[in-house]
Regions:
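A conserved, well-ordered hydrophobic junction motif at loop->secondary-structure transitions
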Residues: 1-159
Length: 159
């Protein structure tokens, strides 16, 4: 549940796009998790930009909180596999769909590797009713602090 996720993460209520983890996953690239994401209309603070009277909200192809959900899911994956709190510091490529409409949203994050500077690499995908609508390849998460074994979320099935 989201209360379990955000008990471990420092994100305030306006930055909590994840509803809960639904599965531990493994593919040819690595292990990770799949989580449910709030519908666009239900993501906290959908209007992130301050606009004056009469100004229009900027048009966006993808809601910023969907990208944030990729970051948070990769962070949860690193907490579980590597025992670290981490923050996003870069990505090799981000691919967005032309339009992201309503439907059931999930995010998958698979840890694909690590580097000598204690960063981890992830591939993350947002799916709408099972079809990919946003993909981040080579998401790099930088380790910020080590966790005690008791602080790991225990979301990913052991090998």
């Amino acid at each position: 549940a989201s209360t379990d996720i955000y008990h471990r993460m420092f994100h305030g209520p306006r930055f909590q796009p994840l509803i809960g983890v639904v599965a531990s996953i493994q593919d040819e690239n690595g292990r990770g998790i799949e989580a449910r994401v709030h519908a666009i209309k239900d993501i906290p603070n959908p209007e992130l930009f301050n606009t004056g009277a009469g100004e229009k909200q900027p048009m966006m192809l993808a809601h910023p909180m969907l990208i944030e959900s990729c970051f948070q899911t990769a962070g949860l994956t690193s907490m579980d596999i590597d025992g670290v709190d981490s923050l996003p510091v870069g990505a090799r490529r981000i691919v967005l769909s032309d339009e992201i409409s309503g439907g059931s949203l999930t995010v998958l994050s698979v840890r694909t590797g690590s580097s000598s500077d204690s960063s981890t690499l992830h591939n993350s995908v947002i799916r709408l009713d099972g079809a990919p609508v946003l993909k981040i390849d080579g998401l790099r998460m930088k380790s910020m602090a080590f966790l005690d074994a008791s602080e790991r979320p225990g979301l990913i099935d052991s090998e």
